[in-house]
């Protein structure tokens, strides 16, 4: 090289598989070779990886890396033009993202008309060009990383430490297509195509290979606080011990590949070996809470009994106290009986509960306390007093886990009774108490209460402020971010507001959290399912609404307490009335008026009184509930805004809604109106006097009168 060969001749020194001998080349030699610019000597290195070579420190070096062979967005557009295909920039970016710019795969996409390529073709190409050429040990490492879109150096070290050291893994990865190393962030990014292929290979691998990958992935997620992802990974291989080893907090109603958390809890109950369950009693109690929250009452009871046997064997008073906190739901919503469990827990526990912490939503994420605990007519106020006492005890055991709940119940009760000033005070008390202790469900409940209260008073400015508060991401609790429960609680508030203010465009959107189906009804979604019913009614699907509501009345009363029943009966009254069945409408309205009479629960009926008004004239209703009907009519409350869809319920003259008289009844009524006695009518119509008397009773009831002198005017 130093002999300075003649100008007309050149020396090419090619060193292949440089990665094998790189350690034998001192850096000074490489620097010397790179300084031969302008000579006839050309040195070419070929390697599957230059990962450890500081090329940027070498002078006069030209190099081509694997990234140079990948097509950029602009390259893909030019490639497509050569094939006579016109691509938009957006299409090119999509193809680049999907293929990583690997030319062979870009070509497949373009040949397929820029549509998604059949997975069989992609898989075969990956198999031929990439997978078959890799060593088994590298395949094993890649399958462990298949769950991640990006992996940093520490993740590679942890997940592959038994396969090779970090340096060796780095050299392997550097040589792989579709795996990009971000030196600045020190992480690897798996192209979507590579990740999809690896997941496909993993899905079709042996169970031992799957276990190796998913178990290690689950352990990584668990140790880094990503519990939901950890549970999903462990469940892939039915690793029940792995699931129970996680801190199963804040997972209520989450989905794992379309499987609910409750279903996973049920599987653990049925299939997890007892020796595994015995190692994780706290996790069993958390699963009990999840089962009850999702209305799986039978499974809750079974697992609760198993957990008690395990805990009693351990002789841990604090753990037994935790069991009592969970066991209290056996007697839900009986506050007095629940209180007995809390008292026993108080005697056992020497530290705050480790189950009912900030991250575990209070009372299943239900945002209404009176929908849970108002269960007996005539006991609205007494329940408020009991709840206040019980919550004080519960909060002492859980470091304030239920803060604001008692105030929320009182505020809801006041709002329902039309005591709007008191309701606002309690609403703010509940809001600030819950914010202090991060009790999310009470926070949302207080927002709903304050907004509803503002609507009832006609203060739309105040109502819109609550809506702004709800929509501001800054007010979302960090531990609830991206959870299904947060979506459900927000949409419960939004959908209730949409029912009260149907003209508000901000609330006209598709709801994600619940459907009209009843088979998956639970404490959290029952409210949102309920307030969807008016949407069905507004579309005039009265028979469908009646079917749903009638079935709902037969559901376990733990899920459908008095406030829910009030809502259901009100809607049933409107629906039956709309299809011309006034008698059935009156039966359901009587429930509403009876509750209003006993506990002064007037606001809901008063808000819809414009549409209920015709029903107030029904004879069976007007005579029995005249006083409470007058209270509903006179309550100072804003009426629901008129919308075209509600025109079916627009009030008309009262006699238009009376039950029609039969031909015989009208005949007898007209004769009686002319002053004929019962005997004279009987003789004229050739019927008995008793028959005349019975027909007149029916006429009086239908026309809502109590004397014969009123007949002429009513008939007219």
Positions of the model-derived regions?
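Alpha-helical sensor/transducer elements of the RecA-like P-loop NTPase core
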Residues: 12, 28-94, 104-109, 194
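Internal alpha-solenoid helical repeat scaffolds
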Residues: 275-446
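Linker/hinge segments immediately adjacent to helix-turn-helix/homeobox DNA-binding domains
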Residues: 112-123, 531-539, 543-565, 569-663, ...
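Helix-turn-helix DNA-binding segment
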Residues: 647-697, 701-706, 713-716
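C-terminal boundary/linker of central alpha/beta nucleotide-binding cores
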Residues: 90, 124-204, 212
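Conserved P-loop NTPase "ATPase switch" module shared by AAA+ and STAND
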Residues: 4-26
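Extended alpha-helical scaffolding segments used for macromolecular assembly and cargo binding
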Residues: 208-283, 290, 299
């Amino acid at each position: 090289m130093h002999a300075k060969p003649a100008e007309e001749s050149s020396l090419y020194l090619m060193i292949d598989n440089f990665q094998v001998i790189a350690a034998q080349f001192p850096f000074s030699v490489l620097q010397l070779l790179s300084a031969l610019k302008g000579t006839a000597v050309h040195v070419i290195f070929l390697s599957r990886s230059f990962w450890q070579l500081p090329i940027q420190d070498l002078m006069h070096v030209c190099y081509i890396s694997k990234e140079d062979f990948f097509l950029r967005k602009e390259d893909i557009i030019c490639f497509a033009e050569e094939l006579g295909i016109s691509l938009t920039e957006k299409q090119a970016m999509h193809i680049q993202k999907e293929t990583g710019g690997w030319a062979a795969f870009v070509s497949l996409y373009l040949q397929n008309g820029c549509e998604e390529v059949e997975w069989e073709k992609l898989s075969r190409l990956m198999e031929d060009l990439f997978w078959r050429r890799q060593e088994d040990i590298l395949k094993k490492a890649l399958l462990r990383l298949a769950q991640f879109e990006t992996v940093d150096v520490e993740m590679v070290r942890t997940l592959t430490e038994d396969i090779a050291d970090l340096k060796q893994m780095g050299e392997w990865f550097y040589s792989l297509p579709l795996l990009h190393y971000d030196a600045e962030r020190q992480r690897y990014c798996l192209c979507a195509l590579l990740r999809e292929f690896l997941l496909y290979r993993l899905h079709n691998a042996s169970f031992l290979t799957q276990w190796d990958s998913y178990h290690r992935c689950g352990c990584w997620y668990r140790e880094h606080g990503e519990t939901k992802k950890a549970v999903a990974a462990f469940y892939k291989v039915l690793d029940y011990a792995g699931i129970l080893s996680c801190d199963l907090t804040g997972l209520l109603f989450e989905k794992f590949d379309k499987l609910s958390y409750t279903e996973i809890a049920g599987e653990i109950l049925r299939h997890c070996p007892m020796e595994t369950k015995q190692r994780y009693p706290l996790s069993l109690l958390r699963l009990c809470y999840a089962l009850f929250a999702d209305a799986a009452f039978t499974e809750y009871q079974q697992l609760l009994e198993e957990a008690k046997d395990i805990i009693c064997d351990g002789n841990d008073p604090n753990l037994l106290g935790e069991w009592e906190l969970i066991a209290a739901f056996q007697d839900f919503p009986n506050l007095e009986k629940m209180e007995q469990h809390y008292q026993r827990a108080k005697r056992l526990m020497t530290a705050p509960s480790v189950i009912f912490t900030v991250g575990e939503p209070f009372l299943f994420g239900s945002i209404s306390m009176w929908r849970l605990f108002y269960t007996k007519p005539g006991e609205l106020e007494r329940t408020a007093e009991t709840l206040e006492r019980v919550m004080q005890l519960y909060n002492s055991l859980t470091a304030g886990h239920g803060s604001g709940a008692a105030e929320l119940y009182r505020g809801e009760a006041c709002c329902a009774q039309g005591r709007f000033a008191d309701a606002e005070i309690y609403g703010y008390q509940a809001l600030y108490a819950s914010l202090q202790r991060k009790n999310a469900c009470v926070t949302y409940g207080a927002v709903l209460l304050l907004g509803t209260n503002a609507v009832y008073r006609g203060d739309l400015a105040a109502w819109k402020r609550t809506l702004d508060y709800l929509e501001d991401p800054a007010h979302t609790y960090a531990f609830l971010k991206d959870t299904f429960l947060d979506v459900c609680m927000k949409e419960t508030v939004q959908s209730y507001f949409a029912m009260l203010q149907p003209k508000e465009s901000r609330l006209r959107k598709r709801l994600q959290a619940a459907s009209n189906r009843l088979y998956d009804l639970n404490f959290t979604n029952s409210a949102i399912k309920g307030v969807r019913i008016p949407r069905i009614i507004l579309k005039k699907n009265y028979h469908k609404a009646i079917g749903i509501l009638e079935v709902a009345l037969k559901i376990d009363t733990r899920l459908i307490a008095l406030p829910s029943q009030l809502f259901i009966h009100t809607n049933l009254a409107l629906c039956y009335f709309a299809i011309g069945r006034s008698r059935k409408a009156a039966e359901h309205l009587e429930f509403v008026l009876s509750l209003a009479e006993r506990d002064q629960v007037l606001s809901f009926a008063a808000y819809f009184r414009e549409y209920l008004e015709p029903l107030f004239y029904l004879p069976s209703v007007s005579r029995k509930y005249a006083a409470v009907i007058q209270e509903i009519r006179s309550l100072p409350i804003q009426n629901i805004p008129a919308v075209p869809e509600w025109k079916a319920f627009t009030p008309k003259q009262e006699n238009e809604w009376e039950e029609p008289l039969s031909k015989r009844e009208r005949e007898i009524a007209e004769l009686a109106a002319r002053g004929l006695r019962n005997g004279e009518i009987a003789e004229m119509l050739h019927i008995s006097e008793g028959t005349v008397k019975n027909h007149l009773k029916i006429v009086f009831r239908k026309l809502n009168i109590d004397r014969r002198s009123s007949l002429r005017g009513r008939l007219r």
